[in-house]
Amino acid sequence: MRSFLHVIWQYLRAFFVIWLCLYAGRGVAWLLPIAIPASILGMLLLFILLSANILPLAWVKPGCNLLIRYMALLFVPISVGIMDHMDILSAQFAPIVISCAVGTLIVLMTTGMVAQRMDNRHSRRLEGKDE
């Protein structure tokens, strides 16, 4: 029984910390003059707390593992909700596909250029020609 209560405590603590970061992100989003989603700010805050070792990973790991395990299931209601707007999506199909393709190409090209620059810098450092 004690082990069961310990596991329940770990999950409750993990979800509470994640929830606190989300609501802290909502507060920060309200204060900022630019529109950044509160959930993104909450994840950024959680990342900063974990990276700075202010928040132990063990406190959020059980809840995060559970959410990641069932992530696909969490997208089902959103996907069903999109079906209600199929007429709008079909009318805007071409712009959606074009923007996705162009965005993908931009990301691929940017990633390739950054990787090449990093590889060139690394090669120069190995040769002793550091900038």
Swiss-Prot record:
Q: How does it sit in the membrane?
A: Multi-pass membrane protein
Domain of life assignment: Bacteria
Q: Which family does it belong to?
A: Belongs to the UPF0299 family.
Where does the UniProt annotation locate this protein? Cell inner membrane
Q: Which organism is it from?
A: Erwinia tasmaniensis (strain DSM 17950 / CFBP 7177 / CIP 109463 / NCPPB 4357 / Et1/99)
Q: Which NCBIfam families match?
A: PRK01821.1
Report the transmembrane regions from the record: 4-24, 30-50, 63-83, 88-108
Q: What Gene Ontology cellular component terms go with this record?
A: plasma membrane
The entry's protein name is UPF0299 membrane protein ETA_12980
Kindly state which keywords UniProt assigns to this record, in alphabetical order: Cell inner membrane, Cell membrane, Membrane, Transmembrane, Transmembrane helix
